[in-house]
């Protein structure tokens, strides 16, 4: 068969197949496919639609939100405790604020009989009978969750991200007039609109796109101010504080979160000063000092506008701190702000600290308060206990950081309605410890700090607390540290107690350097005779009841999340690997072995000069007589190749030259 006939024969069966495929394609295009069931979003599977962004759904409290799985909108589930506590605090603030207007709030799951104790006397029964005859419009007004209260609170969340916090306010906090959920990101505002519609709170929550500072500056006038401002930024809130203290109403509530704990805890004192106007110190009480520095910064900003703060609750939890303060206006009260701030003198050796107030307020016979400069310093140039120098920190807030009456109200509300929040048990534990803290005693010591200073065994918590109570001092725990010792005992009394404890668990004095803090502290005989017998009141109530005071790590790789970035990677994507990559990035790299060997060869070998070096070329030091001698720079390092101990030469035995080594 010829080549042309072969090609013609092979092409014959292909033509019908090609025609059949084309006919089937045209017929399929003309036919309408069967209608499959609609999906949840109302789109059928056969319809052409743009690919949707991958989203994740989160249910927290009464709110349900969706947010991109990519790290485009910031969300951290570990801060659920923060949001639960904020809802509880704003609820009690609304109860106080609206109660003055005769409006009673209704909280889901809360019984009126549990919240208000009613003792019906004869007169009250008559009043109750009169109320039955009142017109419906004259009955006491109430505010419920999810309803607009015309005289209620105007709330601003300056950095709302996904809008979760604002939506929870609308669904869980009664007595609200409006909630403005603001964010500078267009993507975040778009997501907020979606979540607001999803939860059915569009009548209360108003998503807004603007710079948080400009928005607050635009609401400086008294009629336009917000009753509650919530600031939960990524990192430091310092850029927003000046605008916040102006935009909150008189007596309004300001809620601020700080997650830049590395700065506030003393790692970068100069950075802390540039942001908050105070120097942070590295100390065991760094978390409480961070709270007091933020309160000082808030009061300092408010004083510029004849305003001042009153702290309601200040919490250090996990990797952040959270403060709730009320802001008032009053020129006379502002004058006392200087006397509420203090500098901190802290010994670098034993850790003893002293406070120096910036101002002094004293009363005159006429009943007026006179303000003057304080006198100081309260310390000598060297520590009287260990002889070391002092570091200067602050200024910081030196007044109470909690309003115990308000904290008690929040604690009672959470205790009587434990099902309201997912973290109710932790809120009860933390607030219980807060109510036990000494309000007029700033900062604290820790058990391990006291014992490690004098190199002795650590006493039990109840033993040290009992010794302080037997000596006539007050002592408490701190919510910021589980082994804290907050006491009004002066440092000399505290070290006397530790000296008495050391006598029961002696330290080998011959192993202590004469210039060490331990040697100098233990060289003094105690004037106070400590009694370590356990007292019943040494064990705090929160500890006896086994409350959840200090939570363990909630999940793996918990802590601060990456900053939200448009089109960024998911927050959990290779997060552990990135942390390993950036770990110790500021440390100097290890010296290369070859470079180290070359560096050591620049120093002469002392044993070679004495004629006792038996290593020859294997010695890590130079055997050249003309090798340069760099006095003061010669390291005292043993040669790594040395395997046997070489006895010193005759000059070394006579005391002219030290033992084996390098000059």
Curated annotation (Swiss-Prot):
EC number in record: 2.1.1.216
Alphabetical list of SUPFAM superfamilies matching this protein: CCCH zinc finger, S-adenosyl-L-methionine-dependent methyltransferases
Similarity field: Belongs to the class I-like SAM-binding methyltransferase superfamily. Trm1 family.
Residues bound to Zn(2+): 347, 350, 383, 386
Protein name in UniProt: tRNA (guanine(26)-N(2))-dimethyltransferase
UniProt region (Disordered), positions on chain: 534-574, 632-663
Lineage: Eukaryota, Metazoa, Chordata, Craniata, Vertebrata
Protein's job: Dimethylates a single guanine residue at position 26 of most nuclear- and mitochondrial-encoded tRNAs using S-adenosyl-L-methionine as donor of the methyl groups. tRNA guanine(26)-dimethylation is required for redox homeostasis and ensure proper cellular proliferation and oxidative stress survival.
Keywords: Cytoplasm, Metal-binding, Methyltransferase, Mitochondrion, Nucleus, Phosphoprotein, RNA-binding, S-adenosyl-L-methionine, Transferase, Transit peptide, tRNA processing, tRNA-binding, Zinc, Zinc-finger
Transit peptide limits: 1-16
MF term (GO), any: tRNA (guanine(26)-N2)-dimethyltransferase activity
Domain Trm1 methyltransferase span(s) in chain numbering: 56-498
Superkingdom as given in the UniProt entry: Eukaryota
Catalytic activity annotation: guanosine(26) in tRNA + 2 S-adenosyl-L-methionine = N(2)-dimethylguanosine(26) in tRNA + 2 S-adenosyl-L-homocysteine + 2 H(+)
One BP annotation, GO: tRNA N2-guanine methylation
InterPro entries: SAM-dependent_MTases_sf (IPR029063), Trm1 (IPR002905), tRNA_met_Trm1_C (IPR042296), Znf_CCCH (IPR000571), Znf_CCCH_sf (IPR036855)
CDD domains documented for this protein: AdoMet_MTases (cd02440)
Residues recorded as bearing Phosphoserine in the entry: 121, 516, 624
Entry's Gene Ontology cellular component terms: cytoplasm; nucleus
UniProt binding sites for S-adenosyl-L-methionine: 83, 165, 183
Mitochondrion among keywords: yes
ZnF (C3H1-type) intervals: 599-626
């Amino acid at each position: 068969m010829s080549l042309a006939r072969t090609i013609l024969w092979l092409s014959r069966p292909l033509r019908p197949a090609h025609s059949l495929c084309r006919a089937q394609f045209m017929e399929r295009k003309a036919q309408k496919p069967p209608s499959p069931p609609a999906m949840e979003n109302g789109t059928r599977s056969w319809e052409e639609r743009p690919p949707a962004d991958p989203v994740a759904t989160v249910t927290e409290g009464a709110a349900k939100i969706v947010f991109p799985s990519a790290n485009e909108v910031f969300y951290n589930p570990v801060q659920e405790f923060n949001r639960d506590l904020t809802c509880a605090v704003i609820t009690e603030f609304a109860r106080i604020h609206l109660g003055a207007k005769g409006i009673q709030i209704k909280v889901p799951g809360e019984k009126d009989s549990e919240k208000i104790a009613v003792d019906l006397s004869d007169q009250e029964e008559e009043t109750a009978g009169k109320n039955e005859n009142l017109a419906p419009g004259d009955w006491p007004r109430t505010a419920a969750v999810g309803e607009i209260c015309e005289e209620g609170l105007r709330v601003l969340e300056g950095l709302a991200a996904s809008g979760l916090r604002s939506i929870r306010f609308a669904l869980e906090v009664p007595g609200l007039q409006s909630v403005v959920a603001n964010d500078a990101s267009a993507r975040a505002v778009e997501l907020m609109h979606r979540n607001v519609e999803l939860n059915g709170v569009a009548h209360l929550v108003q998503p807004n796109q603007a710079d948080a500072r400009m928005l607050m500056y635009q609401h400086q006038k008294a009629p336009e101010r917000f009753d509650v401002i919530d600031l939960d930024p990524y990192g430091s809130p310092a850029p927003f504080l000046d605008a916040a203290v102006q935009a909150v109403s008189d007596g309004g509530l300001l809620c601020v979160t700080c997650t830049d704990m590395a700065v506030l805890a003393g790692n970068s004192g100069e950075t802390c000063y540039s942001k908050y106007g105070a120097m942070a110190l590295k100390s065991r009480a760094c978390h409480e000092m961070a709270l007091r520095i933020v309160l000082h910064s808030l009061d300092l900003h408010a004083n510029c506008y004849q305003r001042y703060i009153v702290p309601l609750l200040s919490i250090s939890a996990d990797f952040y701190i959270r403060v709730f303060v009320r802001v008032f206006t009053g020129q006379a009260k502002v004058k006392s702000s200087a006397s509420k701030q203090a500098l901190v003198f802290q010994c670098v050796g034993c850790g003893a600290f002293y406070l120096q107030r910036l101002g002094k307020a004293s009363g005159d016979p006429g009943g007026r308060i006179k303000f003057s400069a304080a006198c100081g310093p309260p310390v000598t140039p060297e520590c009287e206990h260990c002889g070391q120098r002092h570091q200067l920190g602050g200024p910081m807030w030196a007044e109470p950081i909690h309003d115990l009456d308000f904290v008690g109200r929040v604690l009672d509300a959470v205790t009587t309605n434990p099902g309201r929040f997912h973290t109710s048990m932790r809120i009860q534990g933390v607030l219980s410890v807060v109510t036990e803290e000494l309000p007029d005693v700033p900062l604290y010591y820790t058990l391990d700090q006291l014992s490690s200073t004098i190199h002795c065994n650590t006493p039990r918590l109840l033993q040290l607390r009992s010794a302080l109570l037997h000596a006539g001092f007050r002592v408490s725990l701190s919510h910021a540290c589980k082994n804290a010792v907050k006491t009004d005992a002066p440092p000399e009394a505290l070290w006397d107690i530790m000296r008495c404890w050391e006598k029961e668990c002696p330290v080998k004095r011959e192993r202590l350097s004469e210039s060490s803090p331990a040697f100098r502290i233990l060289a003094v005989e105690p004037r106070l005779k400590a009694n370590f017998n356990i007292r019943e009141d040494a064990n705090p109530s929160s500890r006896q009841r086994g409350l959840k005071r200090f939570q363990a790590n909630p999940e793996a790789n918990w802590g601060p999340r990456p900053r939200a970035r448009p089109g960024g990677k998911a927050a959990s994507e290779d997060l552990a690997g990135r942390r390993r990559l950036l770990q110790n990035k500021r440390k100097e790299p290890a010296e290369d072995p070859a470079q180290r060997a070359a560096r050591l060869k620049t120093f002469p070998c002392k044993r070679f000069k004495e004629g006792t070096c038996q290593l020859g070329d294997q010695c890590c030091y130079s055997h050249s007589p003309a090798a340069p001698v760099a006095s003061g720079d010669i390291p005292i390092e043993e040669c790594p190749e040395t395997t046997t101990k070489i006895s010193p030469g005759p000059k070394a035995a006579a005391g002219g030259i030290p033992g084996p080594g390098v000059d």
